[in-house]
Amino acid sequence: MHVVLAGGGTAGHIEPALALADALRRQDPTVGITALGTERGLETRLVPERGYELALIPAVPLPRKPTPELITVPGRLRGTIKAAEQILERTKADCVVGFGGYVALPGYLAAKRLGVPIVIHEANARPGLANKIGSRYAARVARLHAGQQRARRPLHRHPVRRSIATLDRAAVRPEARARFGLDPNLPTLLVSGGSQGARRLNEVVQQVAPWLQQAGIQILHAVGPKNELPQVQQMPGMPPYIPVSYLDRMDLAYAAADMMLCRAGAMTVAELSAVGLPAAYVPLPIGNGEQRLNAQPVVKAGGGLLVDDAELTPEWVQQTVLPVLADPHRLYEMSRAAGEFGRRDADELLVGMVYEAIASRR
């Protein structure tokens, strides 16, 4: 059996694909796995690091909204679809599993031409263009938000890597805090804007950090690899403020933290819910509003806070986040609510859908 994964560009598309790859290999160590990608995406680093084959195709970014540029997409896609077809034929693919983004659409269209079954994992409350098109031809579609009004806990969740799905935050916390140079006992705020960072979050946190430190809060802050690290002078007797470019071990970062300030990408919401880490979610103010919808269910369940990007200020952090970090009982209740909302076996559920799709072809 050979499965081709289509989801590249950002960690939000790549990590769930790799979580599925790991789950497939646990079930059948002989399964062949190839990930489609482009030379401009994070997959060029993340996929080989995890030991999987990466096959590159030309990048054809898709407009988020209808624009004049949309008219040119079909012509530019032809060569990319042909390249994807050649990869499916070379690998004798039994299934294409897509996670959205501009890498996924050529994979879907190539699979349709060749009669290869398609499984789509839609992480966002509002699907993007690639998954909207691909779902017309898919044998199975895993939707995180279908039936949201009827069920507090939808059937499908976002596959998360095994190191996070099996994480015991309390047991790992001493090791995690030591690794990052944090105090073993102080309340800890983790800040990250995702794999690329977020300038707005960075600016606000750098401004509010002295007030948080004076209140006894320590901070672990991933600013993003493309952003400059702030110059920090650690004051004797004050809780540490630790800025880093990128966190390669998010499992340890989650274990070290009591709360997180972050964007509301589907992967982030899923990982935090899976490990029971409460968060203050700041949805990205562009796109089609999917990040706000991603976070709303866990926030309504009591596992997080929600603030618009324009409303995120140092004063908001002081007035809203600081009281939570200073209240162990409230942190416990929010952690419990997030953990009850989350799901740790989404990768195995998706493996089942892959096998169903392949069986339906035979």
Curated annotation (Swiss-Prot):
Q: Where in the cell is it found?
A: Cell membrane
Q: Does the record's keyword annotation contain Cell wall biogenesis/degradation?
A: yes
Its placement in the membrane is given as: Peripheral membrane protein
- Superkingdom is Bacteria
Q: In which pathway does it act?
A: Cell wall biogenesis; peptidoglycan biosynthesis
Which residue stretches, if any, does this entry annotate as coiled coil? none
Q: Catalyses which reaction?
A: di-trans,octa-cis-undecaprenyl diphospho-N-acetyl-alpha-D-muramoyl-L-alanyl-D-glutamyl-meso-2,6-diaminopimeloyl-D-alanyl-D-alanine + UDP-N-acetyl-alpha-D-glucosamine = di-trans,octa-cis-undecaprenyl diphospho-[N-acetyl-alpha-D-glucosaminyl-(1->4)]-N-acetyl-alpha-D-muramoyl-L-alanyl-D-glutamyl-meso-2,6-diaminopimeloyl-D-alanyl-D-alanine + UDP + H(+)
Keyword annotations for this protein?
Cell cycle, Cell division, Cell membrane, Cell shape, Cell wall biogenesis/degradation, Glycosyltransferase, Membrane, Peptidoglycan synthesis, Transferase
Q: In the Enzyme Commission scheme, what number(s) does this protein have? A: 2.4.1.227
Q: Which SUPFAM superfamilies match?
A: UDP-Glycosyltransferase/glycogen phosphorylase
Molecular function per GO:
UDP-N-acetyl-D-glucosamine:N-acetylmuramoyl-L-alanyl-D-glutamyl-meso-2,6-diaminopimelyl-D-alanyl-D-alanine-diphosphoundecaprenol 4-beta-N-acetylglucosaminlytransferase activity; undecaprenyldiphospho-muramoylpentapeptide beta-N-acetylglucosaminyltransferase activity
Q: What residues does UDP-N-acetyl-alpha-D-glucosamine bind to?
A: 10-12, 124, 161, 195, 291
The keyword Cell cycle appears for this protein: yes
Question: What are the GO BP annotations of this UniProt entry?
Answer: carbohydrate metabolic process; cell division; cell wall organization; lipid glycosylation; peptidoglycan biosynthetic process; regulation of cell shape
Cellular component GO terms, alphabetical: plasma membrane
Q: Which PANTHER family match?
A: GLYCOSYLTRANSFERASE, UDP-N-ACETYLGLUCOSAMINE--N-ACETYLMURAMYL-(PENTAPEPTIDE) PYROPHOSPHORYL-UNDECAPRENOL N-ACETYLGLUCOSAMINE TRANSFERASE 1
The entry assigns this protein to a family as follows:
Belongs to the glycosyltransferase 28 family. MurG subfamily.
The record's listing under NCBIfam families reads: murG
Task: State the function annotated in the UniProt record.
Answer: Cell wall formation. Catalyzes the transfer of a GlcNAc subunit on undecaprenyl-pyrophosphoryl-MurNAc-pentapeptide (lipid intermediate I) to form undecaprenyl-pyrophosphoryl-MurNAc-(pentapeptide)GlcNAc (lipid intermediate II).
What is the protein named?
UDP-N-acetylglucosamine--N-acetylmuramyl-(pentapeptide) pyrophosphoryl-undecaprenol N-acetylglucosamine transferase
Q: Which organism is it from?
A: Streptomyces collinus
